[in-house]
Amino acid sequence: MKSVLLIPELGTSRKLPPLFSSALSHPLPVPITTTNYVDSPNQTPPLMDPTPTAAARRAAAIARHLAGLPSAATALQSSPCLSYAPPESTEAPPAFAPTELRALLDGHHLRDRDWLFGAMEESPLFCPRRAGGKVFVSPDYNEGKEGQREATMRRIGYLTRRGVFRGWLTEAGPEAELRKLALVECLGVYDHSLTIKLGVHFFLWGSAIKFLGTKRHHDKWLLDTENYAMKGCFAMTELGHGSNVRGIETIATYDSKTREFVINTPCESAQKYWIGGAANNATHTIVFAQLHINGRNEGVHAFVTQIRDQDESVLPNIHIADCGHKIGLNGVDNGRIWFNNIRVPRENLLNLVADVLPDGQYVSTIDDPDQRFAAFLSPLTLGRVNIAVNAVYISKVSLAIAVRYALSRRAFSITADGPETLLLDYPSHQRRLLPLLAKA
């Protein structure tokens, strides 16, 4: 047998010298011990023994690394090649009915959930490849943000054509709401950017129109929102104020002569910041601003404002900037918005809680400003809840991946000739995963 040594620096292969070749048949020698000279500063380290015996020992050690495993069979050699098999194909059938457990965990609208999963399986936008069965392929997080954003919009277009969003804003009642939440959960376990983008459009923009507006707003915008004929975003957060909504600095001044509100960004900290959908796609937004009438500040109110035309060109006197690449959710186009004397009709004020009459008179069914502010924000709670619920979807997916992997991956063997042990048979994995699985 000719032994070959690869020399990386030269990029060539050379035959081992006779010393290395002869060492292949030698047993591994006892490791060489050296004198501890650290404790004696004046003592010099011993020189390497130049005799052939020392060289042979060194050569033997290197040769054993190069020679590979000995001829004697080992547990790893006698085993077939390691390969992956889904747990359901190798484990015994469960002692319970999986369909009944699924019904218990999902709770409601099982057929609607299955219909949506089927619609996603049929589209290469969601299921572009098959690998041992139907496989959902998650978004490519190595793709640039523009590519991820385009993928999100293509998926939304496909789901719109399939009628997934039908009734999400125009139908009312517990049945319609539960069906919508079931479908959102199905989407949430697949693509987080898609879920956030839909959440901004339906649960923030759409819910503001539905729950803060009145019939004139519903008739004008709800159906177009549901059909994605218009794309909405939600401009509440500012660079200087996020959670403290009462402190926002954008100003909407009522002009009684033209019966319009004039919206302005008075300073840099008043720019609308981190607004999902604003950077690329949104045509309209809900602007939260301090309402000024005849020099009096009536507090924060919401105004429907168009920011782009139908070909997605930004309108005059509106400046929009991209928040750029993020550590996650790059399929969502977060942006920044500045307003410079943007005029919107009086009718664009969402007036369920308070209104402004044509002559500039401010009217409200709630006299106390604190109660009025609370009533103004309460319909928006659902959007906040949905963001928290997304963490539950992600936890479900993470736990499923971890358990399936632990039932497939093996590491180390208890006996010399036995199979390697499943990860889930290790107590450390059991303590981490099984309590979470039991609480699912």
Question: Where are these predicted regions, by residue range?
Answer:
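Low-complexity proline/serine/threonine-rich segments in eukaryotic and viral proteins
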Residues: 2-46
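Amphipathic, small/basic residue-rich leader segments at the start of a protein or domain
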Residues: 39, 47-220, 224-232, 242-243, ...
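Secondary-structure capping and boundary motifs in well-ordered enzyme cores
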Residues: 152, 175-176, 197, 279, ...
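Glycine- and acidic
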Residues: 186-190, 202-206, 268-272, 318-322, ...
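Short Pro/Gly-enriched beta-strand edge/turn motifs at strand-loop
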Residues: 230-236, 318-321
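A short core secondary-structure module
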Residues: 256-319
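Long, well-ordered alpha-helical segments
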Residues: 258-264, 308-312, 338-352, 356, ...
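Flexible, small-/acidic-enriched active-site or ligand-binding loops
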Residues: 315-341
